[in-house]
Amino acid sequence: MAEQLKELAEMVESFGTAPTMGEMPCRTLATKGINGPTAAHVIEEIHTPFNLAYVTFTTGSTAFQNVVGVTHSEIDGRVRASLAAFDMANVERHGKFLVTYAPLVNVFSAEALKIHGLDWFFLQRSSRDAFLLSLCQEKPNVLIGESTFIRSALEDASVLGLSHSIPQGVIAFTAGTPLDLDLLQVAEKHNWKIHDLYGCQEFGWLTLDGVPLRADITLIPSPKGSDFREFVVGGLPMADSFPYAESGHVCNPEGKIITYRRARTNPEYEVIVRETKLSSKETTERVARTILRIKGRVVKVDPALKVSSTKTVLDLVPSVSAEGKSTSESYRIEGDDKTFLFETLIEAQLALQQTAKTDQVWKKTR
């Protein structure tokens, strides 16, 4: 028996196909490009499936944050949107980019920052005084942060007699909360250019100064009123509504989506898949479950789903009306251009199924 155990141990050590703990690949905060401090998080190591490029969390202070999975197939779209934002804001390559909140890098994806040649860095501490210190000492060309946080720091600089040390002509992306309009006047004293960047951890950056950064963005009627539009990306609703104004965004008159007047959509839209280019209803149902799990969006599959269609057809339906009753009102989104993100998640699902486990040990059905 002892000899048999010895042989088994040698086989496990020398010929095992599964990795040991030391052989497992590892993604650290540094390899993800987000190795900066925050006051709202604990650093935790987790086992992340290979089919996800990375895991992050939604932001928010009034409800628990959702875990967000970003698939490998989504990275190209995030990169294109991020590079479009840099181009629109005239961000030069190889500049110094101060990121005041490390998880914001996940919205760009570190790949986008690398492609644009930016040298990004973080605060020593996640605090206003550390931000002010970094501005004065590091002299960034570009930065991103919450608008009121930035405004307060610039006002602090004036009170402390440090205004002369603030770098001039900084390009400042504001994100995370609706734009604090008072920042515009404060920033003007330092010849800063303020940009209102809207997006989320789930889908990346979506607009800059009210101008869409992706081709698959659609605006549909919102229950918030006739002046508002529900924001939809790639066929998936954001649950955010914005005024649409021909007068334009305060940072750019060409931008018609007034992102600094955001309102939460209530009731939220659900997505019904009516037609798919997939040949299998079962795969479509798996895509719906995937989107719920990693993006937090409710997608349902029509029992009469048309498979092997020439296009994807999605209906967005409020779960209940404003009066609390069910409603049949829906808004249709179809075609490759407007359902691109949905198609990207289908691509991710198909890639997952190609590497699906066949060993009966892992089957959840018998």
From Swiss-Prot:
Its main location: cytoplasm. Keywords: Cytoplasm, Ligase. It is found in: Cytoplasm. SUPFAM superfamilies: Acetyl-CoA synthetase-like (SSF56801). It is an enzyme of class 6 (ligase). It catalyses: holo-[ACP] + acetate + ATP = acetyl-[ACP] + AMP + diphosphate. InterPro entries: ANL_N_sf. The keyword Cytoplasm applies. It comes from the Bacteria. GO terms for cellular component: cytoplasm. Its EC number is 6.2.1.35. GO terms for molecular function: ligase activity. Acyl-carrier protein (ACP) acetate ligase of the biotin-dependent malonate decarboxylase multienzyme complex (EC 7.2.4.4). Involved in the conversion of the thiol group of the ACP-bound 2'-(5-phosphoribosyl)-3'-dephospho-CoA prosthetic group into its acetyl thioester using the energy from the hydrolysis of ATP. This is ACP-SH:acetate ligase.
